[in-house]
Amino acid sequence: LSSLGLTARAGANPMITGIAVDSREVREGTLFAALPGSRVHGAEFIQYALRMGAAAVLTDAAGAKLAAEELAGSDAALVVSGLPREALARTAALWFGGQPATMIAVTGTNGKTSVSTFVRQIWVEMGLPAVNLGTTGVEGAWAAPLAHTTPEPITLHRTLAEAAANGIT
């Protein structure tokens, strides 16, 4: 994480074996990202993540304050970021590695999945392997469902790395 400008405020210098934003996915050695949410702060799940074996916690100042007691009794490294969601995205990009060199993003209120599907289909007709992500999940060179229409950074970067590994350039 130091290559991203992130340093631990407290805890050990652990060997990270995975990253998770959902405490139910934490295993021994995982970096748990406790992000602020629209209804609940992820820091409310730090105690559970620590019990599951989290070796490090990435959160914001509010999350560190919310979970101060749990973290004080732990060897887990605590990484506090003013922009924890961005820090998680950069961490996930570094963790999963390679991504296709050519990507497009479609924004707006309506038609995003349709437009990205059309672009993928055009690229495939041109002989370019492609996938698109959207409401219908991952489509193209392989298909997979997505839990959210806008995937969390971990899911996004895992999928992009899988695309690169499957020859999507």
List where the protein language model places each region.
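N-terminal leader/targeting and accessory segments in enzymes
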Residues: 1-90, 94
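Phosphate-binding loop of NTP-binding sites
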Residues: 87-169
